[in-house]
Amino acid sequence: MRGCLQLGRWLSAAPRCQAASLRPPTVFPSYRYNRSFSTTTIYYGRSKTTPTKLDLDLEKRIAAIPIERFRNFCIVAHVDHGKSTLSDRLLELTGTIEAGTNKQVLDKLDVERERGITVKAQTCTMIYNYKGEDYLLHLVDTPGHVDFRAEVSRSYASCGGAILLVDASQGVQAQTVANFYLAFAQGLELIPILNKVDLPSSDPERALEQIKNTFEIDTDKAVMVSAKTGLNVPAVLPTVVEKVPAPIGDSTKPLRMLLVDSWYDSYKGVILLVRVFDGEVRAGQQLISFVTGLKYFVGEVGIMYPTETAQTVLRAGQVGYIYFNPGMKRSKEAKIGDTFTRVGYEKVVEPLPGFEEPKSMVFVAVYPVNADLFEHLEDSINQLVLNDRSITVQKESSEALGAGFRMGFLGTLHCSVFEDRLRQEHGASIIITPPSVPVKVVWKSGAEEIITNPAKFPDDDSVRLKVAEVQEPFVLVTLTFPEEYLGKVIELCEANRGEQQSIEYFTATQVIMKYELPLAHLVDDFFGKLKGGTKGYASLDYEESAWRAGNIVRLQLLVNREPVDAVTRIMHSSQVSRQGRIWVTKFKEHVDRQLFEIIIQAAVGKKIIARETIKPYRKDVLAKLHASDVSRRRKLLEKQKEGRKRLRAVGNVVIEHKAFQAFLAK
């Protein structure tokens, strides 16, 4: 009877429940379900057994388009030249999104919208009708900043052409040059487009001259647009259709699919962005990874339109997403550049070459503010690293700050963006050390070792005798700026141990200059000083150059002659004196007074570079004495003095977590 009542309540409540939340009551016997796959799409929070009419119409249109009418392209530009705004206009033009209400649709991260920059390469599929025929266009909005070069390089692998976008008011900038050569090296068809031609400060003729002289590109058919107002934007897509070649692929061959990117979804798990080179992929198929050898069943396939839109199939030439059911158990299984094929064809299909692993150039240590939150921080880092494989992570421990991570990034902006994402997307409260660069130790035995953690630097006299030399990384920096700031830029580069490589004028008033600089100086706010010295008109790009021998030392902070491991850096000897004085002065501000004297020192080996002293609290031991009792007065003062000596010898300085947090804050 009780079971019937429960069943009656459940049936009466069923119409008010969402379809996906329906569950049989516990009084029902358990059944064995046949695990078979279908192309039915499961949406979390609701059930969708049949596609909507809009989805069916979209799928029919895509199915009718042959690979010869596919176009995969990206937008190449310097940061802030209008890539994301132009992407919005193209999406509106093709009816992918509604017009008038969008701003940087493909900038999906909070940090991207706050900073006004693109951090992650985002993709979107569009259908464009040209001369009575549908074309399937796949657009990639790439980052412009040098720190996200790995994102740009991966994006180019899925494209056949690129829009070379140049701000008509600023002209060719440093990262325009760098991104151009990256696209040119991959054989992409380049289409020059001038943006912001509606601005009063725009000079299209000068910008076209710079493009022609710098890149040797025919600018006669360059398109001049204003992405903000939509001026002449309809002329862009016909140029893309005519100039960008169709992708090469065969849907009848066995599946050959490249993993381009991945991200984490709290419901679906790891989602993969893929480019299908041959064959086709559907829900229910079993795939195998060439890198790991692991097998997975496909749960769903689809395209970004501009959000995840499920499809029945992805064909050769398409770029889309897939996720597995059951999903990947560990985020590390998603190897960027991996090739997937169907189980049984792994000996027939040749794996694709993949991508070159980017090298970390800047390292920081990250610790949770509260030691109890270490596991939460670890989970948060793993989820973000899944979406950015250029980051390296190693666990480490500090006596002062507890368990944490040593993390490597491609640059200081890359590090700063990751820090913002940790705080905003995962609510992490963290302490992060200032960025440092790796050094190479060449031993007298001939062996070489890359040191990324200052704690492992050979500083002891006995170990130092075995070292032949210590080398630091140099980078080749490309600077573009107006001619009037030439003197200030040269002065800044020379002050940072730079060596001039070349200087040329690509117009009468614009200079391109190349310098070799130590990477350690570049990450020490060099770009901020450059912007300040040129009133914001200079731009910068850099690439790896070489390792050079130098007088590299380890600077440590000592508190009562005990080293504080959380405040240690490897640097050139020329920086030591200035940095040491900054450290001791700043650290003194954040350490509480004790009953004994606290000595704060900056040291290189046994040599003290700078010192500050925090005086102890003073206790008036003479308060109860008569003024005439001189011998008693002297005896009590001597006793107090001896007591302070003992305290200083055995007393442990208590430095609170918040002191480190304040000291390490930017």
Curated annotation (Swiss-Prot):
It catalyses: GTP + H2O = GDP + phosphate + H(+). One of its GO terms (biological process) is translation. It is found in: Mitochondrion inner membrane. InterPro entries: EF-4, EFG_III/V, EFG_V-like, G_TR_CS, LepA_C_sf, LepA_CTD, LepA_IV, P-loop_NTPase. Pfam families: EFG_C, GTP_EFTU, LepA_C. One of its GO terms (cellular component) is mitochondrial matrix. It is a peripheral membrane protein. Its EC number is 3.6.5.-. CDD domains: EF4_II, LepA, lepA_C. Keywords: GTP-binding, Hydrolase, Membrane, Mitochondrion, Mitochondrion inner membrane, Nucleotide-binding, Protein biosynthesis, Transit peptide. GO terms for molecular function: GTP binding; GTPase activity; mitochondrial ribosome binding. It comes from the Eukaryota. GTP binds at residues 77-84, 141-145, 195-198. Residues 1-44 form a transit peptide. Residues 68-248 form the tr-type G domain. Promotes mitochondrial protein synthesis. May act as a fidelity factor of the translation reaction, by catalyzing a one-codon backward translocation of tRNAs on improperly translocated ribosomes. Binds to mitochondrial ribosomes in a GTP-dependent manner. PANTHER family: TRANSLATION FACTOR GUF1, MITOCHONDRIAL (PTHR43512:SF7), TRANSLATION FACTOR GUF1-RELATED (PTHR43512). Belongs to the TRAFAC class translation factor GTPase superfamily. Classic translation factor GTPase family. LepA subfamily. This is Translation factor guf1, mitochondrial. The gene is guf1.
